[in-house]
């Protein structure tokens, strides 16, 4: 893989960033890479005997090889299922770059590729003074865009790609994640996305209820 790490963002909340990220991890591992996931900030965590845990972060941990320590994979685990800025304020936490950068550096020593999953859509802030673009810039990461394929996705994908470029960052690929089984003319919509997005498509994840990320990884075609 040309890039030792990349940042996975999405066209919105709930469009399958975690499925895209875990499928990427399995695809990378299938190529023989040591690949680990990271979820720098996660809200909506549940309290367990081991501490606060997030479902998406646990999925990334399970898909990783080697499997990193949870606190390194998810430095900020916030209880409330809210925007990170609000969830952090609820527990008196101020999100900062330094702990994330430190954890990221540790993960880089453990694997060949680190897949960093963002929060919500690209413009969702991390705090009052910290945008996702700031984090991506600080970690010097290219971006992979997961497009939730449903009505309106062409608009959302083009706006997100334009926002990433306007922030001076590079989007190196996109993944079509089919999230609406009732969507009409899906092939044509994906074709329109291919025509209008400048970066290459890294494959598609079909609507397949109950399928795990390892199975969905077969739909991806990663660059060499």
Swiss-Prot record:
Record-listed E.C. numbers: 6.3.3.3
Any single GO CC term annotated in Swiss-Prot or TrEMBL for this entry: cytosol
Catalytic reaction(s) noted: (7R,8S)-7,8-diammoniononanoate + CO2 + ATP = (4R,5S)-dethiobiotin + ADP + phosphate + 3 H(+)
GO molecular function annotations of the record: ATP binding; dethiobiotin synthase activity; magnesium ion binding
Subcellular location: Cytoplasm
Sequence intervals crossing the membrane: none
Gene3D superfamilies noted in UniProt: P-loop containing nucleotide triphosphate hydrolases
Residues annotated to bind substrate: 43
Pathway(s): Cofactor biosynthesis; biotin biosynthesis; biotin from 7,8-diaminononanoate: step 1/2
Pfam families membership: AAA_26 (PF13500)
NCBIfam families in the record: bioD (TIGR00347)
Name listed for the protein in its UniProt record: ATP-dependent dethiobiotin synthetase BioD
Organism in which the protein naturally occurs: Xanthomonas euvesicatoria pv. vesicatoria (strain 85-10)
Annotated family: Belongs to the dethiobiotin synthetase family.
Named cofactor requirement(s): Mg(2+)
GO BP of this protein: biotin biosynthetic process
CDD domains: DTBS (cd03109)
Active-site positions on this chain: 39
Domain of life: Bacteria
Quaternary data: Homodimer.
SUPFAM superfamilies: P-loop containing nucleoside triphosphate hydrolases
Binding site for ATP: 56, 117-120, 177-178
Alphabetized UniProt keyword annotations: ATP-binding, Biotin biosynthesis, Cytoplasm, Ligase, Magnesium, Metal-binding, Nucleotide-binding
InterPro entries (alphabetical): DTB_synth_BioD, P-loop_NTPase
Function field: Catalyzes a mechanistically unusual reaction, the ATP-dependent insertion of CO2 between the N7 and N8 nitrogen atoms of 7,8-diaminopelargonic acid (DAPA, also called 7,8-diammoniononanoate) to form a ureido ring.
């Amino acid at each position: 893989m040309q890039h030792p790490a990349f940042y996975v963002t999405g066209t919105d909340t709930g469009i399958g960033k975690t499925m895209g990220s875990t499928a990427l991890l399995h695809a990378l591992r299938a190529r023989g890479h040591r690949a680990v996931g990271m979820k720098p900030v996660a809200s909506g965590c549940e309290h367990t005997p081991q501490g606060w845990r997030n479902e998406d972060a646990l999925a990334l941990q399970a898909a990783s090889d080697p499997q990193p320590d949870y606190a390194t994979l998810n430095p900020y685990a916030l209880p409330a299922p809210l925007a990170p800025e609000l969830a952090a304020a609820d527990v008196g936490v101020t999100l900062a770059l330094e702990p994330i950068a430190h954890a990221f550096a540790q993960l880089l020593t453990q694997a060949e590729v680190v897949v960093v999953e963002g929060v919500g859509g690209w413009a969702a802030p991390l705090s009052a003074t910290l945008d996702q673009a700031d984090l991506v810039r600080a970690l010097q990461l290219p971006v992979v865009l997961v497009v939730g394929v449903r009505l309106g996705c062409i608009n959302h994908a083009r706006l997100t790609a334009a926002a990433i470029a306007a922030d001076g960052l590079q989007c190196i690929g996109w993944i079509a994640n089919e999230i609406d089984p009732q969507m009409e003319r899906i092939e044509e919509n994906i074709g329109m996305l291919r025509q209008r997005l400048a970066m290459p498509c890294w494959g598609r994840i079909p609507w397949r209820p109950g399928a795990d990320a390892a199975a969905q990884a077969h739909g991806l075609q990663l660059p060499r």
